[in-house]
């Protein structure tokens, strides 16, 4: 891997520690990336352990082929297919799941992926380049209302409507085909600037999240993870922006909350099912040293939960 396309795993030791790995256990890395977390998990597994690693990016799967370890099973699929893949592999329960969300450094730093406004490249943004629409294809057909909704909801951008109108006006003169074109359009439409942040940051984030259905993927996989965890198994999730973390925080909180007693019904608390999860510690963020060494770690938040008793 070239130096430019290296990926530094965030909260590496903390995340693997949080999995509380059993040497002969079965674990899932939902986002293989360049294998930083997976390698650390493999280092703690015994000869009978097993790691199933997902990634929807063909480049990540190709990079993973360099790991010659029979305990590792690489799966080219989004983690929303977690349950289907485990069924296919004959795995009914796992001892831990790690989800390192968001976009990887190689995806951002490879100009050909079209995810960053730092390069003028084809406007793609797909994590899985083998299927689905590119951002350029979607922008060519989307209405002003649809573009506004995506940029507002997924980018939390207050100038979403102005940006959407500018995109619609610009495409009348020809397709918006490159990241440079889009960044210039957004830059002109944003009337005020946030210190230290490019005007197109929120819009690019929004379009990437939307085109890859990142939040829908997350909402799908979380309950599937809990359903497959064995008793005492850990779910470890690292989020990188508030939209992701909000979903994770709410899900874990709800799963760890005891069920409410129905009002006016003769039901005892002992008759209700226990919560499926128990929260483990508080949300954890990278320390100053890690952020200094890897500035992209600054927004990371790690949350951990453990599976409570599983009914026979």
Curated annotation (Swiss-Prot):
Stated EC number for the protein is: 2.1.1.199
> What UniProt keywords apply to this chain's record, in alphabetical order?
Cytoplasm, Methyltransferase, rRNA processing, S-adenosyl-L-methionine, Transferase
- Where along the chain is S-adenosyl-L-methionine bound? 35-37, 55, 79, 100, 107
SUPFAM superfamilies associated with the record = Putative methyltransferase TM0872, insert domain (SSF81799), S-adenosyl-L-methionine-dependent methyltransferases (SSF53335)
GO biological process: any one?
rRNA base methylation
Pfam entry (one): Methyltransf_5
Identify the NCBIfam families for this entry. 16S rRNA (cytosine(1402)-N(4))-methyltransferase RsmH (TIGR00006)
Give the family this protein belongs to, as stated in its UniProt record: Belongs to the methyltransferase superfamily. RsmH family.
Name this protein carries in UniProt: Ribosomal RNA small subunit methyltransferase H
Gene field: rsmH
């Amino acid at each position: 891997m070239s130096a430019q396309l290296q990926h530094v795993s965030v909260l590496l030791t903390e995340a693997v520690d949080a999995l509380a790995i059993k040497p002969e256990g079965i674990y899932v890395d939902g986002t293989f990336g360049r294998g930083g977390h997976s390698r650390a998990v493999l280092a703690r597994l015994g000869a009978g352990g097993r790691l199933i690693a997902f990634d929807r990016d063909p480049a990540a799967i190709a990079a993973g082929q360099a790991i010659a370890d029979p305990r590792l099973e690489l799966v080219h699929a989004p983690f929303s297919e977690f349950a289907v893949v485990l069924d296919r592999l004959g795995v009914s329960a796992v001892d831990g799941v790690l989800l390192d969300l968001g976009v990887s450094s190689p995806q951002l730093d490879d100009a050909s992926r079209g995810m960053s406004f730092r390069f003028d490249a084809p406007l793609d943004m797909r994590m899985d380049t083998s299927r689905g629409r590119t951002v350029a294809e979607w922008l060519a057909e989307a209405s002003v209302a649809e573009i506004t909704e995506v940029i507002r909801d997924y980018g939390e951008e207050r100038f979403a409507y102005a940006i959407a109108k500018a995109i619609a006006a610009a495409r009348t003169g020809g397709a918006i085909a490159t990241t440079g074109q889009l960044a210039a359009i957004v830059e002109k439409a944003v009337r005020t600037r946030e210190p230290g942040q490019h005007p197109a940051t929120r819009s690019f984030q929004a379009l990437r999240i939307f085109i890859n259905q990142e939040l829908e993927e997350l909402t799908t996989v979380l309950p599937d993870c809990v359903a497959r965890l064995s008793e005492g198994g850990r779910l470890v999730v690292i989020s990188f922006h508030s939209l992701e973390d909000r979903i994770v925080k709410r899900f874990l909180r709800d799963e760890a909350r005891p069920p409410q007693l129905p009002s006016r019904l003769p039901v005892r608390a002992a008759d209700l099912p226990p919560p499926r999860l128990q929260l483990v510690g508080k949300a954890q963020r990278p320390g100053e040293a890690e952020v200094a060494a890897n500035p992209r770690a600054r927004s990371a938040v790690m949350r951990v939960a453990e599976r409570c008793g599983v009914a026979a």
